[in-house]
Amino acid sequence: HIPSPDNQLLAVSCMPPELTDGTYESHIYVLPMTGGEPKDLTGPGLSYLHGWSPDGKELAYCAFRKKPEEETMRIEICTIPSDGGEEICLTDGKGYNDGPEYSPDGKHIWFNSTRSGLMQVWRMNRDGSGLTQMTDFDANNWFGHVSPDGKHVIYLTFAKGELEPNEHLPNMYVSLGMMDYDGQNKKKVLDLFGGQGSINVNSWAPDSRRIAYVKYVLHHK
């Protein structure tokens, strides 16, 4: 769930309550922060919310889509107006695309994708142009989160070979990496036992000086 920039609305992705036949779907809804009737923006299919644009006009999400003439499911980065409207998929069907997040100035969308082989952090303009790979080392990198001051990006790294590139599981040794907004000065911040859930959402402090993360405690007998 993500609050709107003005804190008046709440966006969530969840299973529609009317599905009682065992079918699984995930729709994106918007409702008043104080409660009320939710508005279904995406309709049938699998849509997983990740970002709300700083101007409050759009939502960005990971969408599983398949046209009638297609044999396999596409995992795309899509956007939709926050008050409802046409879905626009910004990626081109290449690879597994996930984790879209707007930059603080709203000019870019950061996401991760296997389009180059391993999972890597990418950046594109808000309209889908200017696609740029931001990490390129021999590991699987997920969930690039931009600091509020727009200077740094934190991301989660899984070692190559331990998982398929499109997998991010819990209970694993992983690391947090950081780079400048332009992709320079990459460095490891720390190693931890965690994985899925460690930094799935942007958890930078408002002053950009610290970041919260989840690690798991190892119990030795």
What annotation goes with each model-predicted range?
Residues H1-E18, L31-T34, P38-K39, P44, ...:
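Acidic, proline/glycine-rich low-complexity intrinsically disordered segments
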Residues H1-L10, P44-L59, D92-N112, D138-L156, ...:
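Conserved beta-propeller blade repeats
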Residues N7, E18, G56, K67, ...:
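Feature marks short, surface-exposed loop/turn motifs that line or immediately flank catalytic pockets
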Residues S13-I28, T42-S47, C62-I77, T91-N97, ...:
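A flexible loop/linker signature enriched in serine peptidases of the S9 family
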Residues P32-G36, P81-G85, N125-S129, D180-Q184:
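Short loop/turn segments that connect beta-strands within beta-propeller blades
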Residues E37-T42, E86-T91, L131-T135, K187-D191:
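A short beta-strand motif characteristic of beta-propeller blades
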Residues Y181-Q184, V189, S198-W204, V214:
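CBM-like carbohydrate-recognition segments
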